[in-house]
Amino acid sequence: MSPRKTYILKLYVAGNTPNSMRALKTLRNILETEFKGVYALKVIDVLKNPQLAEEDKILATPTLSKILPPPVRRIIGDLSDRERVLIGLDLLYDELVDNDLNSSLMDALGVPDIEEADS
């Protein structure tokens, strides 16, 4: 089994508004559930650090950026839909591809599926 990738993410928020806090809470829940121990999240308050928002061309908050692994992906706005966040950042796709690769490798090696082994 290959080592899991490390995910680097940035969440841009505008102060401690309810929308910002909800985005952060939802995102942390997703990351702790799906990527525990293999992610780094940097929260950037664009009101306190407008230069960082300008450098990264952030025009709206909340904005979530996946920096690593490439390609860079962004989601702007509502982060409450877990599947939308994972698909939008190519995180769900990465997990599906890893599972498909494992399945293809097992097929190539002639290892039967669990259902076949029981019959």
UniProtKB/Swiss-Prot annotation:
Annotated keywords: Biological rhythms
InterPro entries, A to Z: Circ_KaiB, KaiB-like, KaiB_domain, Thioredoxin-like_sf
Cysteine disulfide links: none
Gene Ontology BP terms: circadian rhythm
Alphabetized CDD domains for the sequence: KaiB_like
Presence of keyword Translocase: no
The record's note on its domains: Has 2 forms, fold switches to a thioredoxin-like fold (KaiB(fs)) when bound to KaiC.
HAMAP family: KaiB
Family annotation (PANTHER family): CIRCADIAN CLOCK PROTEIN KAIB2, KAIB-LIKE PROTEIN 1
Subunit composition and interactions: The KaiABC complex composition changes during the circadian cycle to control KaiC phosphorylation. Complexes KaiC(6), KaiA(2-4):KaiC(6), KaiB(6):KaiC(6) and KaiC(6):KaiB(6):KaiA(12) are among the most important forms, many form cooperatively. Undergoes a major conformational rearrangment; in the free state forms homotetramers as a dimer of dimers. When bound to the CI domain of KaiC switches to a monomeric thioredoxin-fold (KaiB(fs)). KaiB(fs) binds CikA, leading it to dephosphorylate phospho-RpaA.
Family affiliation: Belongs to the KaiB family.
Function: Key component of the KaiABC oscillator complex, which constitutes the main circadian regulator in cyanobacteria. Complex composition changes during the circadian cycle to control KaiC phosphorylation. KaiA stimulates KaiC autophosphorylation, while KaiB sequesters KaiA, leading to KaiC autodephosphorylation. Phospho-Ser-431 KaiC accumulation triggers binding of KaiB to form the KaiB(6):KaiC(6) complex, leading to changes in output regulators CikA and SasA. KaiB switches to a thioredoxin-like fold (KaiB(fs)) when bound to KaiC.
Database matches in NCBIfam families: circ_KaiB, PRK09301.1
Annotated protein name in UniProt: Circadian clock oscillator protein KaiB
Lineage of the organism: Bacteria, Bacillati, Cyanobacteriota, Cyanophyceae, Synechococcales
